[in-house]
Amino acid sequence: MVVPIGINGFGRIGRLVLRASLENPECRVLAINEPFMDVKYMVYMFKYDSTHGRFKGTVEDINGEFVVNGNKIHVFAEKDPANIKWSSVGAEYIVESTGLFLSTEKAGVHLKGGAKKVVISAPSTDAPMYVMGVNEETYESSHDVISNASCTTNCLAPLAKIIHENFGIVEGLMTTVHAITATQKTVDGPSGKDWRAGRSALSNIIPASTGAAKAVGKVLPALNGKLTGMSFRVPNCDVSVVDLTVRLEKKATYEEIKKVMKAASESDKYKRYIGYTEDEVVSTDFIGDTHSSIFDAHAGIALNDNFVKLVSWYDNEMGYSTRVIDLLVYISKKN
């Protein structure tokens, strides 16, 4: 069965989810809802990408139809998601990627239009969160609206899981050095309660809050209350990096930790989600990398055998978007 997908919102994640879907023969995007672009502009935005480069296939506007690699994708232009008739084009699994409808109630309106399941491409206020390689096996088919968590949680959770299963995590702090996102400002401007967030993304390293570390406790209950963290937003268009500093229950040399992470990256269970490198890499080396988390063996350090700093990279756009597709395909099989 080819999973029939609809995408609500054709922004950064929406467009990259479409790109990711084209690399997975188990799914096909049948429809996109985008009320703020006409088809010609959608073609342009999909064809040219300042970060990931020009789309290597074909994308056309043919008589008002959005056509990618010869396949027509129906375009809706509904501002109210409750009015999208997904069933009219056979789209059953919906990606909610507007960033606006983050609760079970708000994202659940897609079900009125014929959707069977909805995956929110962001942390949700109340929907169950799943991270591939971590807790997807706990998914229950009764859950119609779920969340793919955040890009940072997708990087951190697999790393934390493997370390905890092998050495035990007593407690830890995470910092993500995070690329800029669309919510930030190019020049200084007003920003409500978070004044620092209103400063220019192009000129500053901006400390910010993140719920990514605490969210690990939701997908890995054994670590609930043991992790917290923060973010530094940096002037970088894509690719972020997690710095996880943990106190271990079981003594381990850094070489032993490296061996465990390398083995995980080569295992059938984790190799799609976890990468491993001993190269002298920098952030641009990971643009387009579809792993959730790439362990940097040469970047981490140990103070002693119980206290270590671990470093793992992630393409916060392409890696995350690929996981959205993986989650959709996974739940379709469970259903």
Curated annotation (Swiss-Prot):
It is found in: Cytoplasm. GO terms for biological process: gluconeogenesis; glycolytic process. InterPro entries: GlycerAld/Erythrose_P_DH, GlycerAld_3-P_DH_AS, GlycerAld_3-P_DH_cat, GlycerAld_3-P_DH_NAD(P)-bd, Glyceraldehyde-3-P_DH_1, NAD(P)-bd_dom_sf. SUPFAM superfamilies: Glyceraldehyde-3-phosphate dehydrogenase-like, C-terminal domain (SSF55347), NAD(P)-binding Rossmann-fold domains (SSF51735). GO terms for molecular function: glyceraldehyde-3-phosphate dehydrogenase (NAD+) (phosphorylating) activity; NAD binding; NADP binding. D-glyceraldehyde 3-phosphate binds at residues 150-152, 181, 210-211, 233. Pfam families: Gp_dh_C (PF02800), Gp_dh_N (PF00044). Pathway: Carbohydrate degradation; glycolysis; pyruvate from D-glyceraldehyde 3-phosphate: step 1/5. Its EC number is 1.2.1.12. It comes from the Eukaryota. NAD(+) binds at residues 12-13, 34, 79, 316. The active site is at 151 (nucleophile). Homotetramer. NCBIfam families: GAPDH-I. This is Glyceraldehyde-3-phosphate dehydrogenase. It comes from Dictyostelium discoideum. The gene is gpdA.
